[in-house]
Amino acid sequence: MIKTTKWLPFIFIIAACNNNKSADNSKSDNHADHQMVTAHDYCDSVNKGLIAEDTLKGSPHRSAMNTINNNHVHIEYNSPGVKGRTIWGGLVAYDKVWVTGAHSATSVQFSKDVEINGTKIPAGKYAFFTIPGKEKWTLVLNKNYEQHLTDDYNEAEDLVRVDVVPTQHDMVQRLTYHVNKIDDTKAEIVVNWEKLQVALPFASL
């Protein structure tokens, strides 16, 4: 009995240390979540003019989604900033395949089949690329979404290509995607950056 009593203070100290570690880990996890939310909201605030100067380094990971005719459309991308740079014909070269984001290929996932420019696209996950031009852009849906930038891009893996004319838009500092509903079965994937906008129409089957 005396031996057990002797060790009790040490047991209490160890238990207290473990409890403190758990609390610290919980705080750390909560802080990480807070940072993620802040980075996402930051881009929206910059685009709305609520933050005068974009000082965030890097290209935060963002997402866009909508449900069209019970078809969940989900886009994952990274969002670079203008930051006073020349974008078109500068940072983004004309007439070359562009990741239309940063770091990894932008991915678009459809939970149901869709039709794009007369081509049926099976439900699945795909890479979204563009080829910007001075007068027109080519929008591309490609099978290989697991690649860095366009390092492994292969035109033979394209499912569909659509030529569109970009339209002028109010300044958007951080590249942003939207899935805009047109009617019950039709929608468009919209890309805004700097003062240009391009859109890829599709129909949910």
Task: Please describe what each predicted stretch is.
Residues 93-147:
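Mid-length scaffold segments of soluble, non-membrane domains
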Residues 3-10:
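Sec-dependent signal peptide recognition
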Residues 10, 59-61, 103, 109, ...:
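Short, solvent-exposed coil/turn segments
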Residues 14-16:
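C-terminal motif of bacterial Sec signal peptides marking the signal peptidase cleavage site
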Residues 20-91, 96, 150-205:
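Primarily secretory-pathway and cell-envelope proteins
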